[in-house]
Amino acid sequence: MSEEKNTRTVNGRVVSSKMDKTLTVLVERRVKHPLYGKFIRRSTKLHAHDEGNEGREGDWVSIQECRPLSKNKTWRLVKVLERAAS
């Protein structure tokens, strides 16, 4: 049975690319406050595997969930959507 799982894909901003073959990606989402109804921005930092060291700080990237690659890395870089202004 070769069934592919539906893997999550999210977009975010690269906040660090100092590690070898690893990016830190900030993913923001908007949630509604339960009592007041105001939309609040919440964020999550994820470590993503970058095989070719393509991502640079400030880039807008797409990452996809994958099997655990290390203690903290369970995401893989799919593509760079927009380069940061240099």
From Swiss-Prot:
GO MF: rRNA binding; structural constituent of ribosome
Keyword Transport on entry: no
Stored CDD domains: Ribosomal_uS17
Matching SUPFAM superfamilies: Nucleic acid-binding proteins
Keywords: Ribonucleoprotein, Ribosomal protein, RNA-binding, rRNA-binding
Gene Ontology biological process: translation
Superkingdom of origin organism: Bacteria
CC per GO annotation: cytosolic small ribosomal subunit
Function: One of the primary rRNA binding proteins, it binds specifically to the 5'-end of 16S ribosomal RNA.
Subunit structure: Part of the 30S ribosomal subunit.
Family: Belongs to the universal ribosomal protein uS17 family.
Name listed for the protein in its UniProt record: Small ribosomal subunit protein uS17
Organism from which the protein derives: Halorhodospira halophila (strain DSM 244 / SL1)
